[in-house]
């Protein structure tokens, strides 16, 4: 089996990012981004998706976190698109429900080749530890646009904003793990009647 790894660099006037992933990893993670709450959530993707992630970013944090959070999502999406290759033999679809105390979220993903995001998270607070939670919409939109996936995110219940977000990222990691998993019964075939994704 060919290694499903990728390394991507993205340089703009706002951010300089290096991201490496291994879809068949063990959940190892290393981050140097400068946004602790984002790093905490990315760790959930690695751990629950069993995807090795290594991301470094120098961003214009003196302005705010917006460019950094969005551009990390973009770069991670680019890395996924590279690592997954032609998509032959993958399950393609993934889904997960994840609870954390009072919070429950559902994430469903399709590596369809068509970007689309439906995100419904009724945050109970605007910030967590000074982090603007609205920025996660920008993160996921950046990911979706560059990984070329259809992504549905629903927080079904929750009163603690940290818990709401953490269940989203844990479910996202688990849905990714399911979708990119190689299906032996597919025998390397394209998971689409069109023959292309």
Curated annotation (Swiss-Prot):
Keyword Methyltransferase: no
GO function term, MF aspect, one: imidazoleglycerol-phosphate dehydratase activity
Lineage: Bacteria, Pseudomonadati, Pseudomonadota, Gammaproteobacteria, Pseudomonadales
EC number: 4.2.1.19
This protein's record includes keyword Lyase: yes
GO (cellular component) term, any one: cytoplasm
Keywords: Amino-acid biosynthesis, Cytoplasm, Histidine biosynthesis, Lyase
Catalytic activity entry: D-erythro-1-(imidazol-4-yl)glycerol 3-phosphate = 3-(imidazol-4-yl)-2-oxopropyl phosphate + H2O
GO biological process terms held by the UniProt record: L-histidine biosynthetic process
Entry's localization field: Cytoplasm
Gene field: hisB
Name recorded for this polypeptide: Imidazoleglycerol-phosphate dehydratase
Pathway where this protein functions: Amino-acid biosynthesis; L-histidine biosynthesis; L-histidine from 5-phospho-alpha-D-ribose 1-diphosphate: step 6/9
Signal peptide interval: none
One Pfam family cited in the UniProt record for this chain: IGPD
Protein family per UniProt: Belongs to the imidazoleglycerol-phosphate dehydratase family.
PROSITE patterns per record: IGP_DEHYDRATASE_1 (PS00954), IGP_DEHYDRATASE_2 (PS00955)
């Amino acid at each position: 089996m060919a290694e499903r790894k990728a390394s991507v660099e993205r340089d703009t006037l706002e951010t300089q990012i290096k991201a490496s992933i291994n879809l068949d990893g063990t959940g190892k993670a290393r981050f140097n981004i400068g946004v602790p709450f984002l790093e905490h959530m990315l760790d959930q993707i690695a751990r629950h998706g069993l995807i090795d992630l290594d991301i470094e970013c120098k961003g214009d944090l003196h302005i705010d976190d917006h460019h950094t959070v969005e551009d990390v999502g973009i770069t991670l999406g680019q890395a996924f698109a590279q690592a997954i290759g032609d998509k032959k033999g993958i399950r393609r679809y993934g889904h997960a429900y994840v609870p954390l105390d009072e919070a429950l979220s559902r994430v469903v993903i399709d590596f369809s080749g068509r970007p689309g995001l439906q995100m419904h998270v009724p945050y109970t607070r605007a910030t967590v530890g000074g982090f603007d939670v609205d920025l996660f919409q920008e993160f996921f939109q950046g990911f979706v646009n560059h990984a070329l996936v259809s992504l549905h995110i629903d927080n079904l219940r929750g009163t603690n904003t940290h818990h709401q977000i953490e269940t989203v990222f844990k479910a996202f990691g688990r849905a990714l793990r399911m979708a990119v998993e190689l299906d032996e019964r597919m025998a390397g075939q394209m998971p689409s009647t069109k023959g292309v994704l």
